[in-house]
């Protein structure tokens, strides 16, 4: 039952941002994202956040078992979420809460809270950026099927990540 509740919470968090309207038609045209947009601060913040996060996962050498009762002290993801200055407070609080909830589950939450996948590519690039919606799509270099949508938001003149993996 806890797994179902945890999964429902994860899905609710990542489903709260509707990135594409139902009327959007698929076409074979290339994205109209310009290199100027991709090189702007907002998508670069999204890329930096995902690169830092995957680096944290890559360098996780703590050897701490999964049955530790206090992930706040040991879980590298929790520690990263708590200390990074690249995410909004709303997103930080949601991630910290979900990390603890997933940690208490026997099998965790399944998909990663940030990427929405069970795997990741540490080599990343910006695929597209919709400045109107604040949506950045990050793609794996070695695994092009690995794509993560990241929502960015300007808070007091600073671009921050406000959602990811939805």
What do these predicted ranges mean?
Residues 4-13:
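Sec-dependent N-terminal signal peptides
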Residues 14-20:
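C-terminal segment of classical bacterial N-terminal signal peptides
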Residues 22-131:
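Flexible low-complexity loop/turn motifs enriched in small/helix-breaking residues
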Residues 126-133, 152-158:
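A short, structured loop/turn motif at beta-sheet edges
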Residues 133-135, 147:
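Intrinsic-disorder/low-complexity, polar/charged segments enriched in Ser/Thr/Lys/Arg/Asp/Glu/Gln
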Residues 135-141:
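Short beta-strand segments that buttress and anchor functional surface loops
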Residues 145-166:
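Short beta-strand edge/turn micro-motifs at domain boundaries
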């Amino acid at each position: 039952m806890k797994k179902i509740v945890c999964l429902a919470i994860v899905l609710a968090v990542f489903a709260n941002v509707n990135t594409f309207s139902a009327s959007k038609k698929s076409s074979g045209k290339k994205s109209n994202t310009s290199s100027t947009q991709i090189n702007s601060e907002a998508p670069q913040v999204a890329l930096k956040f995902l690169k830092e996060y995957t680096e944290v996962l890559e360098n996780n050498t703590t050897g701490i078992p999964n049955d530790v009762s206090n992930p706040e002290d040991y879980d590298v993801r929790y520690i990263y979420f708590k200390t990074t200055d690249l995410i909004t407070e709303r997103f930080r609080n949601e991630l910290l809460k979900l990390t603890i909830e997933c940690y208490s589950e026997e099998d965790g939450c399944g998909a990663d809270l940030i990427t929405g996948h069970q795997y990741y590519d540490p080599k990343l690039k910006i695929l597209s950026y919709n400045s109107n919606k604040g949506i950045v799509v990050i793609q794996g270099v070695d695994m092009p099927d690995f794509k993560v949508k990241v929502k960015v938001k300007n808070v007091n003149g600073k671009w921050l990540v406000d959602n990811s993996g939805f």
